Amino acid sequence: MSQCQIWVRHHLCCSFQIPTLAASLFQLGRCRSVKEFEKLNRIGEGTYGIVYRARDTQTDEIVALKKVRMDKEKDGIPISSLREITLLLRLRHPNIVELKEVVVGNHLESIFLVMGYCEQDLASLLENMPTPFSEAQVKCILLQVLRGLQYLHRSFIIHRDLKVSNLLMTDKGCVKTADFGLARAYGVPVKPMTPKVVTLWYRAPELLLGTTTQTTSIDMWAVGCILAELLAHKPLLPGTSEIHQIDLIVQLLGTPSENIWPGFSKLPLAGQYSLRKQPYNNLKHKFPWLSEAGLRLLNFLFMYDPKKRATAGDCLESSYFKEKPLPCEPELMPTFPHHRNKRAAPAATEGQSKRCRP
């Protein structure tokens, strides 16, 4: 960890306004200036900042440069960005995006995060690739997501916004989880958190029903949605509203009850919805070609009761990954030079993927 990273990590718990923080970093010589990076093109927008593809003029390395969006009302850095920086400074794993350093803006009015660059994100790949991922490739992707998530959860962090557009992939087939703007550290006792997190299509039923008790299980529900999306080549539960999202879940998994989900009826919003009576689990009908091991894994991820839902460790032990077709090696994942060049073009599209509209 660089001197700059150590200093930032130590001081971010303080209530710095951003000009004060940026000036302090620059004047003390602890962080580099953004002038040392050549912005090549804008490649996207995270939860709390704009992301550029850039070149480090000192090393010629291509990086992702994320400009932290300012809080105009408070003339400072949003608490969400502070959380993202402090969390990423703690995390070092091959399947989690790397925060290399923090640099300051041209006029000391802003800060930028220098991240490891990944050539593509899974959402845009799924929309544009001519041939869908094979099942062996899907397994390769999911294993990497699960390894990163196991590390994250063992570090007592919940991502809270897992979706295909937040999964990046390098040209060497390495999948990395990104965008930690909504992530939270958790502990015992579990502190209340807002249920208005996680993109709608990937949101766990307990969140839709208003729980403020959030655990790693909300990430695991999202993993189930991601696996299903990779297998089906389209989003599994593309709800247009919260009530529509709940209805889609019930159509797929059946109506929840106290028998299968103790405490369900006491959730804050449980009494506000009139759930259809649907007694069947339709996962097998949705994926008739999927093996029994694959269906068991999906069902384990889609358990209504968060306490019974699969953990990342449970999933990594699944027999689904030990049966044919076996997961391919990351190095054997397909590359997408046409898509990469499209992203790298100066006129690259800046709009969000259709897969992450909610």
Curated annotation (Swiss-Prot):
GO terms for cellular component: ciliary basal body; cytoplasm; nucleus. The active site is at D161. Residues 37-321 form the Protein kinase domain. PROSITE patterns: PROTEIN_KINASE_ATP (PS00107), PROTEIN_KINASE_DOM (PS50011), PROTEIN_KINASE_ST (PS00108). It is found in: Cytoplasm, Cytoskeleton, Cilium basal body. The gene is Cdk10. Keywords: ATP-binding, Cell projection, Cilium biogenesis/degradation, Cytoplasm, Cytoskeleton, Kinase, Nucleotide-binding, Phosphoprotein, Serine/threonine-protein kinase, Transferase. This is Cyclin-dependent kinase 10. Cyclin-dependent kinase that phosphorylates the transcription factor ETS2 (in vitro) and positively controls its proteasomal degradation (in cells). Involved in the regulation of actin cytoskeleton organization through the phosphorylation of actin dynamics regulators such as PKN2. Is a negative regulator of ciliogenesis through phosphorylation of PKN2 and promotion of RhoA signaling. Its EC number is 2.7.11.22. It catalyses: L-seryl-[protein] + ATP = O-phospho-L-seryl-[protein] + ADP + H(+); L-threonyl-[protein] + ATP = O-phospho-L-threonyl-[protein] + ADP + H(+). The keyword ATP-binding applies. Residues 332-358 are annotated as: Disordered. One of its GO terms (biological process) is positive regulation of MAPK cascade. One of its GO terms (molecular function) is protein serine/threonine kinase activity. ATP binds at I43, G44, E45, G46, T47, Y48, G49, I50, V51, K66. Heterodimer with CCNQ, the interaction is required for kinase activity. Interacts with ETS2. Interacts with PRK2. Belongs to the protein kinase superfamily. CMGC Ser/Thr protein kinase family. CDC2/CDKX subfamily. It is an enzyme of class 2 (transferase). The modification Phosphothreonine is found at T194. SUPFAM superfamilies: Protein kinase-like (PK-like) (SSF56112). InterPro entries: CDK, Kinase-like_dom_sf, Prot_kinase_dom, Protein_kinase_ATP_BS, Ser/Thr_kinase_AS, STKc_CDK10.
